[in-house]
Amino acid sequence: MKKRLAVLLVIVLTITFSFSVTTRIKDIAFFRGARDNQLFGIGLVVGLNGTGDSGNVNSPLLLEMMKKFGVQVSENDLKSKNTALVMVLADIPPFAKEGMRIDCVVASIADAKSLAGGYLLQTPLYGADGKVYAVAQGSVIIGGEDVKLSSNLQKRYRVVGYLLEGAIVERDIPSDMLDGDSVTILLRQPDITTAARVARAINEKFEMDLAKAIDPSAIKLTVPSAFQDDLITFLSLVEEIEVQPDVPARIVVNERTGTVLFGGDVKLSDFVISYGNFTISVTGGKIGDKDATISNLVSALKAAGATPQDIIAILQVIYESGYITGELIIM
């Protein structure tokens, strides 16, 4: 027997964002020049209990990388199962100074079975310009060893580890936010409306035309003469200004986890669709006696017991037919 249901989406987990909130500018944007920089290098982890490299890996690419990074390892070292070649990665934050410590990640680049219990020998970390900005050394910490979901998951975690504050900054990375008498605010999620709102909020706060949105991702901000010698104080005031970001109408479906996330002003046009044992209808902007909202459709689908596969198929058909106003993303 067919069930007449007004349904759209529900899966194992459904997350809804249908309300507007205000947030600080610092939570949705950053100043150009104040960003992380990536560092990388190749090092050697020692002290492994027979879980290191087998010595059978003879990749020309790997040998070339070792030569480029100045890694001098003997043939015997490569054959020892107590050592492992690793890639060392780190993000150095803006304004990091010489002597500060940063975290880093190590990952096996050969055929080691596990880095647990290993110790990373002194490894220089390079920036994109080829200069050394930090040096890493220390005990490798392995996360996820107690995860029992699958043997494959455990293996994957054992060949990736991290060093908590394991790298020392050796060279400052230049971070210049000021361009003449102005700075640029960059939105983490570019949006025309949000950019305009940020500029308007700043101008209202200081009661002068200081900010102007130049594109969906950037707002140019002129530093007032009163703050020319106190840029940090001015920027701290700007960061604390609250704005209401514009949220696009969007539905995101993750097929693997059965998660549906929807936000913004997602609307439904009138339609009738028959799918399997379901007949779905929206008439006059109503689902029965309720408004044709995503939340009401979700509730109906939960009660109906539709499978994630049903939901994804229905969403695709409705979206491709033009009855959903917004963007559908299936991951």
UniProtKB/Swiss-Prot annotation:
Main location per the UniProt record: periplasm
Ordered alphabetically, the record's keywords are: Bacterial flagellum, Periplasm, Signal
Compartment(s) of residence? Periplasm; Bacterial flagellum basal body
The terms under GO molecular function for this entry are:
structural molecule activity
**Protein name, per record:** Flagellar P-ring protein
Checking Pfam families in the record gives: FlgI
Tell me which species this is from.
Answer: Thermotoga maritima (strain ATCC 43589 / DSM 3109 / JCM 10099 / NBRC 100826 / MSB8)
Q: What HAMAP family does its record include?
A: FlgI
Spell out the NCBIfam families in the cross-references. PRK05303.1 (NF003676)
Its biological purpose is as follows: Assembles around the rod to form the L-ring and probably protects the motor/basal body from shearing forces during rotation.
Q: How does it assemble?
A: The basal body constitutes a major portion of the flagellar organelle and consists of four rings (L,P,S, and M) mounted on a central rod.
Does Signal show up as a keyword for this record? Answer: yes
Which GO terms are recorded in the biological process aspect for this UniProt protein?
bacterial-type flagellum-dependent cell motility
**Encoding gene, per UniProt annotation:** flgI
